[in-house]
């Protein structure tokens, strides 16, 4: 994957994650821009480039799948903006907590 592809993926993920929140979206875009510009002078064969590209992809994936924004609705409640890319867990590990034996661990063998 190239740096340009990672940049575009990160930009798109920020657009999805921060849609409707102009100040945060602007700050995210500026941060993306600044970080990529700062590294733009590195030679193409620099060994540090690939790990940075992978990190950008991880951040894009996190923004797209795991970040949910909420707006206060009063009475200590929030309205969450969950979109089509938001990862939804089934909470199986929570439902079965405390039922049965441990699968290992330090002292519960």
From Swiss-Prot:
Its main location: mitochondrion. It is found in: Mitochondrion matrix. GO terms for molecular function: protein folding chaperone. CDD domains: Complex1_LYR_LYRM7. GO terms for cellular component: mitochondrial matrix. Residues 83-93 have a biased composition (Basic and acidic residues). Residues 68-109 are annotated as: Disordered. Keywords: Chaperone, Mitochondrion, Transit peptide. The keyword Transit peptide applies. GO terms for biological process: mitochondrial respiratory chain complex III assembly. The keyword Mitochondrion applies. Interacts with RIP1. Belongs to the complex I LYR family. MZM1 subfamily. Assembly factor required for Rieske Fe-S protein RIP1 incorporation into the cytochrome b-c1 (CIII) complex. Functions as a chaperone, binding to this subunit within the mitochondrial matrix and stabilizing it prior to its translocation and insertion into the late CIII dimeric intermediate within the mitochondrial inner membrane. Modulates the mitochondrial matrix zinc pool. This is Mitochondrial zinc maintenance protein 1, mitochondrial. It comes from Verticillium alfalfae (strain VaMs.102 / ATCC MYA-4576 / FGSC 10136). The gene is MZM1.
């Amino acid at each position: 994957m190239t740096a340009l592809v990672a940049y575009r993926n990160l930009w798109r993920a920020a657009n999805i994650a921060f849609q409707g929140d102009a100040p945060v979206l602007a700050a995210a875009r500026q941060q993306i821009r600044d970080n990529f510009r700062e590294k733009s002078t590195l030679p193409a064969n620099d060994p540090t480039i690939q790990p940075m590209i992978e990190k950008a992809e991880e951040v894009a994936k996190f923004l797209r799948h795991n970040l949910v924004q909420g707006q206060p609705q009063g009475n200590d409640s929030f309205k969450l903006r969950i979109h089509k890319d938001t990862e939804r867990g089934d909470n199986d590990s929570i439902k079965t907590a405390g039922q049965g034996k441990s699968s290992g661990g330090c002292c519960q063998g």
